Amino acid sequence: MNTKWTETQKSAIFTPNCNLLVAAGAGTGKTAVLVERILQKVINDSEEVDIDKLLVVTFTNAAASEMKERVGEALSKLLELNCTSKNLQRQLALLNQSNIMTIHSFCLKVIKNNFHRIDLDPNFRICDDTESKLLKQDALLELFEEKYEEENLGFLNLADGYGGKNDSKLQDIVLSLYEFSQGSPWPKRWLQDVLKDFNLGSDFDFGDTKWAKVLMHNVTVELKGCKNKMKNILNTIENIEGLEHYLEPFKSDIESIDKLINITTWDEIRDEFIKLSFNKLPSKRTDPLVKSYKDKARNTRDEVKKKLISIREDIILCTDDIYENFKEVYPLMKSLTFLVMDFYEKYHNKKSERNMIDFNDIEHFCLEILTSKDKNGDIIPSEAALEYREYFEEIFIDEYQDSNEVQEVIMNMISRKNIYANLFMVGDVKQSIYRFRQARPELFLEKYNSYDEKEGSKNRKIKLSENFRSRKEIIDAINYIFKQIMCREVGELDYGEEECLKSSARYEPFEGNCGGDVELHVVDKKENENKLEDENEEELLDAISVEARLVASKINELVNPSLDQYSFKVYDKEIDNYRSIMYKDIVILMRATQNWAPAFVEELNNSGIPVFADTSVGYFQAIEIKTIISLLQIIDNPLQDIPFIALLRSPIGGFSPEDLIDLRVVNREISFYEILKAIKEHSLELKYSLEHIDERLEYKVEQFFNKLCLWRRKVIHMPIDEFIWHIYIETGYYGFVGAMPGGIQRQANLRMLFERAKQYKNISYKGLFNFINFINKLKSSSTDMGNAKILGENENVVRIMSIHKSKGLEFPVIILSGAGKRFNLTDINKSVLFHKELGLGPEYVNSERHISYPTIVKQVLKRKLKMETLSEEMRILYVAFTRAKEKLIITGTVDNIENTFQRWCEAAYCEEDKLPEYSLINSRNFLDWIGPAVARHPCGEIIRKVCPFEYNLNLITGDDSKWKVFVYSKDNFKSTLDENIDEDIIGKIKSLELDNNKEIYKNEVYRRLNWTYKYEQSSKIAAKFSVSELKRRFKLIDTENGIEFMEPIYLKKPAFLRESKGLTPSERGIVMHLVMQHIDIDKVGSYEQIKEQVDKLVFREFITEAEAKSISVYKIIKFFNSEIGIRMKKSNNVYREVPFYMEIESTELYKQLPQHIYRDEKVLIQGIIDCYFEENNELILVDYKTDHVGDIDSIKEKYQVQIYYYGRALEKLTGKKVKKKYLYLFSKDYILDLS
């Protein structure tokens, strides 16, 4: 292999006999390294490892397939170089049975090979996510019914306290806690352990608990924030004359806070907070000029005081009641944990009845097979695990940062220990963004912080930091931002020099518009106070649409630059050169696409930008899906008026609003179905009013009612998927939606519903009722499937996708939008919180007194979960930044630009390189992390200028990153993108001194009105000509220098003068060419032979009877008896109807164009050569003409252009010289030499 590996990559590839953690930063080639290590294992003669003796687990099926494919390609290339290698042949043969797979696939393989060890039926099946949800809901409803029947007091108290109005909240808690517990290797044991935390003994001391440790740390961070605010104000007022009397109180406050920060025990900090007091600020008249500083100082001190009092009242003193609170909370938590374990049993039984397992079972059953207990009850590898440990020579774990605890135990059970350590883990903890799937980045961090970088270590760490993806401008920006914001508190890793990416991507130097500074675009959502009174509501855009218009403007600037701008270029590896940017090079990334993507799609479409949003919502709201579901609902139960009316109004029903009114008038007390039935049957049993129902409506009712009855009979005997497709075709609805706007997407949605029904028939639920129930539960549980995907990878559209979906991908241009969107912290406000280490954090509830408030434990968990959520958000931001190859643009909106920039500058007002932890924790969105970092960059001057309060920030001047910061008002985007303005346009016009500059403006108006496009002639150059079109479009002129052309004027003969009797001359010519193409030239010696061949063409349906009659067999005989026909028959190589394409310079056709400007403009010439044959290694070209001609010289002039280009193309096509060029005129049986 010719890859040039870096030294650290070589170490990762060749380091033997150890547990190896490879911390591979974004774009550092981790997959290539992993593949190469696998290769070296199997091609190294000294090791003699077969590829099936290696276990390679990946995160996704796509990653596993790619890995296997890359290994296969590499082995094939090696085999080409050494085709006799038995080992390479063997490894390629073993590749298909290799263990390169997802962790779930491996676990499934273990289960299938060892099902007898856990008493599992070998014929089990895996239920999909939707069937699992349905089964869980059924199990949960049954469980709750049983508990109510038992009148279980603990359950009843639990339902009163946490159930809400209809127990739905308690059901959500049970399901959530069950799912969360599945992330533990032993879920029931974890539930039992967390319950013990609430059963307090008499010697309980909060200061000794795990909760106190977390709370102490959080309080310390908040205290540091308070101290920093006071220090910043003190630094500001120290140099302001007139505020000297504030210095001592502020210094005293800082000392008090410092004292609290340095306390290390809970009891001591509690005592100090109780004694905490604040001296009153001395009052003294000050100069009005310093009043703003005085007010700022007072307000900051009041804010700090309020914060400290809040900590004392809401946290410190709350611990005094913890013992009493826990006495009441413990029985509730006991009932909750027992309820979850009962649910586990019921759900497990339901799966067993159906002989199925779910995805959680796959890992847990595998774990059960691979573990056992020793005599002390400790977990040890089972016999099966030891067999796998012996079998696998090395275990590779890709994307290790996304592993969970269950997977960690599984890998530990089958990996070797001590001197035979064989675990290879590769990943990047900075890209761990799947905590919601129970991923545990702590597993990676534990090894990252404990493994040694020294060679020979049994637990070794190697860092890959050379980025081969992104331009230096992007790498510099990534390092600049994350060195300031990613720390152990927020991000769970201190991003220092060792974690910085190093730019190693190869981008050839280019003088044009490419790459460039990272751009930050901030829009102020605040309405303009001077807004015109007549502004209409349409222009009052919401924040998402405003940002979408900004993005559309930026995309158009890149893809469709104005005349005075150069086109943006991107480097294309396939052509190894720069090319103009295309829409498909641009991806808009969002934290979440729901609500945002539709607005962006609309605005981009309005701007003429093709766009595709990869969303997971909107499917069930599509009109075609709603219509079909309504149809299914009334087939199941026709008495439902809402879906019935929806169907009647749809194209399937075809009823008008007036029709529905007439039907409703029949009887207002009964359903529409009953009304239709009464009309159909002319029922006289009830006093219906049918007089106003005319024959037309009666006929329509009868037709619809008959169809409905037929469908209701058919659905009983047909599988649901077949029935749905039958409906599509019988009603013609599938074709109908295909003709609607967005028809391809709509038909894809219908096919997706059909496929979903196909999957449904394979699950344990059957029938139309259950299918409708299944769909309704999907809708109610927010499991929207998203629109069906209809775009391929190479469609030239801008893509909108979530940051999560972009992980592992790369794109030339990334626009990170929605950077001002608030972080979603709703999960930390639930009534019961869960944490792996800290256990349960419930609300204190008292149903009798109707009170509830968060326990101190819930406050601890809330703070801890907020930190972990923010850490995840920071890693998500890192993933977004590192997707960009050549250009990174960040956009976001803020509520008030001045207040926001002041907040940013205040956060950036610190001496350390890292931004303060408290400001990172209190950030609301991505912009609150990016903004302060950019504010202290030299390029962030606009942030510092707009900030209403002057901060003397310590600028970071030694950094290589380059930024462009743009600030907009919401008013900039009121109308269309082309109408964007930088300031109030009315005021701008009024400020112009028109009287003093009339002549200047007059000249400018004339200049603009008389402007002509410099290259207008190029717009008239055709991209492609056929040779015959060339002959028609241009008139030949003979000059001394060769052939020139001029465009003639043609006047068409009026239609009424044109006759149409039989075949036209053109049609007769086509038929003659067809016969001459297919005729066998070895059988043209007589009339009968040629006639027989023409008849065969009729029989084979090449031509019709009428067309055959237009053929003159005698004309064909004369051709083959002519000089040129005889020469053709003698040739061994005759070619007929040969198509060609040839590029020529546009100036060759358009002589009026300047040569130096249009030399590179090409025109494509295409045509079909009737016949050519070889003669003495040279070519003879023959073109047939069936026209009725008069003057031979006029024919020569008419066709010379065509034959000229035929000859030129033929020489270029074959590389041989064309010796002679002939026209054969069938009308005169004449050969014309045009050589």
UniProtKB/Swiss-Prot annotation:
- According to the entry, every stretch annotated as the UvrD-like helicase C-terminal domain falls at 509-808
Q: For binding ATP, which residues are annotated in this chain's numbering? A: A24, G25, A26, G27, T28, G29, K30, T31
**InterPro entries in alphabetical order:** AddA, DNA_helicase_UvrD-like_C, DNA_helicase_UvrD/REP, P-loop_NTPase, PDDEXK-like_dom_sf, PDDEXK_AddAB-type, Restrct_endonuc-II-like, UvrD-like_ATP-bd
The SS bond pairs are: none
Q: What is its EC number?
A: 3.1.-.-, 5.6.2.4
Keyword line: ATP-binding, DNA damage, DNA repair, DNA-binding, Exonuclease, Helicase, Hydrolase, Isomerase, Nuclease, Nucleotide-binding
Recorded catalytic activity of this chain's protein: Couples ATP hydrolysis with the unwinding of duplex DNA by translocating in the 3'-5' direction; ATP + H2O = ADP + phosphate + H(+)
**UvrD-like helicase ATP-binding domain location, by residue?**
3-471
Provide the GO MF annotations for this entry. 3'-5' DNA helicase activity; 3'-5' exonuclease activity; ATP binding; ATP hydrolysis activity; double-stranded DNA binding
**Key word ATP-binding present in the record?**
yes
Q: Is Cell wall biogenesis/degradation there in the keyword field?
A: no
Which Pfam families does the entry mention?
PDDEXK_1 (PF12705), UvrD-helicase (PF00580), UvrD_C (PF13361)
Output the GO biological process annotations, alphabetical, semicolon-separated. double-strand break repair via homologous recombination
One GO cellular component term = DNA helicase complex
Cofactor annotation: Mg(2+)
- Gene3D superfamilies documented for this protein: 1.10.274.50, 3.90.320.10, P-loop containing nucleotide triphosphate hydrolases
Q: How does it assemble?
A: Heterodimer of AddA and AddB/RexB.
Q: Family per UniProt?
A: Belongs to the helicase family. AddA subfamily.
Could you tell me which NCBIfam families the record lists for this protein? addA_Gpos
> What PANTHER family does the annotation carry?
ATP-DEPENDENT HELICASE_NUCLEASE SUBUNIT A, UVRD / RECB / PCRA DNA HELICASE FAMILY MEMBER
Described by its record, this protein's role is as follows:
The heterodimer acts as both an ATP-dependent DNA helicase and an ATP-dependent, dual-direction single-stranded exonuclease. Recognizes the chi site generating a DNA molecule suitable for the initiation of homologous recombination. The AddA nuclease domain is required for chi fragment generation; this subunit has the helicase and 3' -> 5' nuclease activities.
Q: What is this protein called?
A: ATP-dependent helicase/nuclease subunit A
- The gene name on file is addA
